[in-house]
Amino acid sequence: MVDILRLVWYHQLEVRAMLINSVVQREAVRNEQMILQYESLIGELPKGSITCRKNGYYYLRYREDGKLYDRYIGKGAEKVDAIREKLALRKHYVEMLSALKREQKTIHRLLEELA
C-alpha cells in the first residue's frame, strides 16, 4: 500500500513539473514575440533629443553610425510637441524592451533548471 501511495505521489510531481515546464515555455514564446514587436515599434520612432537654437528654431539631434546629426523640425509648436510625444513613447518602449529582456534571461535560466 505504501509503495502505491509513493508511486502516485511521484506521478503527481512529474505531472506538476510537466505543467510548470509547459507554462514557462509558453511564456518564453510570448516574451520573444513581444520583444520582436517592441523592436519593430522602436525602429519606426525617431531617436535623439530636441534642441532649440537661436530665434526658436528646433532641431532633432541624434546619432547614426557614430556621427551626430541635426534635423530641422521648425518653429511650430505642433511639430515639436508631436516629436516630443514620439520621443517619450520611444523611451517607454525602450524601458519595456529592457524589462522584457531581463525577464527573458530569467525564463531561460528557469528552463535550464527544469531540463
What are these regions (language model features)?
Residues M1-A115:
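A positively charged, amphipathic N-terminal helix/segment that binds anionic biomolecules
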